[in-house]
Amino acid sequence: MRTALRTSLAAFSAAAIALTVSALPRSAGAQTLNDPTIVAIFDAANTWDMETGALAVKRAKTHDVHEFAEMLVRDHKAVRQQGRDLAKKLGVTPTPPANFGMAKDHAAAMAKLSKLTGAAFDKAFLAHEVAYHKAVLDAVTTTLLPALQNVEVKDLVTKVGPAFQAHMIKAQSLLDSYPTK
C-alpha cells in the first residue's frame, strides 16, 4: 500500500507538470508561451519546491532527508530570487498561464504528502522530488528553453539546470538507500 501510494504520488506529480507545461503552446486558444509566462512558471516551480521542502523539514524522519529538504528550500529560494531580480531588471511582469493547472496539481501533491508521517512520508517525498525534478527538466528542455526569447532569461534557466539535475539525483540516491526498516 505504501509503495503504491508513493508510486502514484510520484506519477501524479510528474504527469501533472509534464501535461500542463507541454500543453501550453498547443492548446487551441491557449495563452502564448512567451517570456513573461515562462518567468511565471519558473517562479512557481521554485516556490512549489520550497513549499514541499519546507513540509519535509518539518516531517522528515531521517537526518538525510531533513538535510536534503533544507538544501531544496535554500537552493530554490536563491534561484527564485535570481529569477525575480532578473525579471525586475528586464521589466518583465511574470504572467501565469491561463488555467494554470499546475497550481492545483501542487496543492493536491501537498495534500497527499501532508497526510503521511515517518518513513512513509520520507519515501513519498523523495519519490515526489525525483518525479518533480525530472518533469521540470523535461519541460525546460523540450518546451520552455525553445520558447524563450530573452537571452538573459534563457541563460538563467540554462544555468540552474545542473542544480535541478543534482537535486533529482540526490533524491533518487536517498530513495534508493532508504532503510527498509
Task: Describe these PLM feature segments.
Residues 3-10, 19-181:
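His/Met- and acidic-residue-enriched segments that coordinate or traffic transition-metal cofactors
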